[in-house]
């Protein structure tokens, strides 16, 4: 039986774009590269964008990898999203699947960034997400990655499910969907390439 979490749906991350109340140092290099695969994903991408732009940690770049979307509306939405902020970049490639799109995003990410964070085009993050993951990794140097719990929603309500299964670790590891990972460590293990046909 599903347990419905009692949250005001109007307040979920990304519902609105909030005003940032601090100055951003234009000379500061990006520290985090957010990688988002995109394939005809225009339905939720604007809310995903808002949840990124609302972050309390401002030193990021957002690399959206269009994985060969054929839909014209999807392409137009990407153009709109890219104009929202100078830290947003849209890349285009032939369709090759989610894993290949993520690897392409990693390859094309700013060489100065220290961390890679994966965020799918229909996912939202709380406004302190980047800040919390960043400081968790900075203060735990032996850790390679950080992630949080998730709340699912179906477009109308939030749903809480205990759906993790350790048997999924190798073929369908859901913990990486919004994880932040040290870029050097990720590259050392070959990113997603070797598991491309099985990855989510």
For every predicted segment, state its role.
Residues 44-46, 71-81, 124, 128:
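Acidic helix N-cap motif at the loop->helix transition within catalytic regions
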Residues 93-111:
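Glycine-rich, basic loop-to-helix element that forms the pyrophosphate-binding segment
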């Amino acid at each position: 039986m599903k347990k419905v979490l009692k949250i005001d749906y109007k307040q979920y991350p990304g519902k609105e774009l909030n005003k940032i109340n601090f100055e951003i140092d234009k000379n500061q290099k990006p520290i985090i590269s957010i990688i988002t695969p995109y394939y005809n994903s225009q339905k939720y991408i604007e809310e995903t964008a808002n949840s990124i732009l609302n972050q309390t940690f401002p030193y990021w770049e957002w690399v959206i990898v269009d994985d060969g979307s054929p839909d014209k509306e999807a392409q137009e939405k990407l153009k709109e999203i890219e104009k929202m902020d100078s830290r947003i970049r849209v890349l285009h490639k032939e369709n090759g699947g989610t894993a290949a799109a993520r690897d392409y995003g990693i390859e094309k990410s700013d060489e100065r960034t220290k961390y890679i964070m994966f965020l799918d085009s229909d996912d939202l993050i709380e406004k302190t997400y980047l800040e919390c993951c960043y400081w968790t990794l900075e203060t735990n140097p032996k850790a390679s990655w950080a992630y949080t719990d998730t709340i699912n929603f179906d477009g109308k309500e939030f749903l809480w499910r205990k759906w993790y299964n350790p048997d999924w670790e190798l073929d369908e590891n859901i913990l990486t969907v919004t994880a932040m990972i040290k870029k050097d460590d990720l590259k050392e293990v070959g990113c997603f390439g070797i598991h491309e046909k099985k990855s989510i």
